[in-house]
A protein has these predicted regions:
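The feature captures the beta-strand-to-loop junction immediately N-terminal to the Walker
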Residues: 34-36
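Conserved ABC transporter NBD signature motif
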Residues: 57-65, 74
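Conserved ABC ATPase "signature" region
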Residues: 98, 113-131
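Conserved ABC ATPase signature
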Residues: 110, 135-139, 143
Length: 238
């Protein structure tokens, strides 16, 4: 399944943040967007995830413009976890993960046997079985982020979009989340597209790094190709 960004421009109000961006996301890998604050990383992720309408250009998923997909149809192929997300504190981890089954459910009834099986397997994959009946509000920051990632996985998407999944976490939890993402990519073959600020974390797990600056994509390559002094000076001024 192929994902292409074709000549996309996007912004907010009178401000243009992306200008004519083109990108092909390789299937089955981990691609990470990096760049300075305000470079358009999260904006590009939102456009791909259909949370923001582009001003020009289009996103093409599996040979079809993403705007042609119905909400449920798209949710079976792509899941996005924004940087900020909230749930009522009394909701249990198991219930939160069950919400991820919405594209596969009929109506608003109880989870089917198939749904429950997917929830069970997802809790195992994300090492959350012991927390199934714990209210989300009682979890640590790292545990809570794993629960949200588990909810997106319960959609059984082919593409997983993560906007700064390590934000507000301590160093240990940041590494735990990145290792979880790497493990899910290897086990499930799911394509991951994410935004990260930390270059060490990005280098640790990414197959491809994409740098953004001045509304454009500036570089695309492996971590070894991108994390070179001249490129870091260009993108970050360091």
């Amino acid at each position: 399944m192929k994902l292409d960004v074709k000549s996309v421009s996007a912004g907010y109000g009178g401000k243009l943040v992306l200008d004519g961006v083109d990108l092909t996301v390789p299937e089955g890998g981990i691609l990470t967007l990096v760049g300075a604050n305000g470079s358009g990383k999260s904006t590009l992720l939102k456009v791909i995830g259909r949370l923001l309408e582009p001003r020009a250009g289009e996103i093409v998923l599996d040979g079809r413009a993403i705007r042609s997909y119905g909400t449920t149809e798209l949710a079976r192929k792509m899941a996005i976890l924004p940087q900020l997300h909230h749930a009522a504190g009394e909701i249990t981890v198991g219930e939160l993960v069950g919400y991820g089954r919405f594209p596969h459910r009929r109506g608003f009834g109880q989870l089917s046997a198939d749904d429950r099986a997917v929830v069970d397997e997802t809790l195992k994959l994300t090492r959350l079985e012991p927390f199934r009946n714990r209210p989300v509000g009682t979890l640590s920051g790292g545990e809570r982020q794993r629960a949200w990632i588990a909810m997106t996985l319960a959609q059984q998407p082919r593409f997983l979009l993560l906007d700064e999944p390590t934000t507000f976490l301590d160093v240990r939890c940041q590494f735990d989340i990145i290792e979880l993402v790497c493990d899910l990519n290897r086990r499930l073959g799911i394509t991951v597209l994410m935004v990260l600020h930390d270059l060490n974390l990005a280098a640790r797990c990414s197959d491809i790094l994409v740098t953004l600056k001045e509304r454009k994509i500036r570089h695309i390559g492996t971590p070894a190709e991108i994390l070179r002094p001249e490129i870091l000076r260009d993108i970050f001024g360091i």
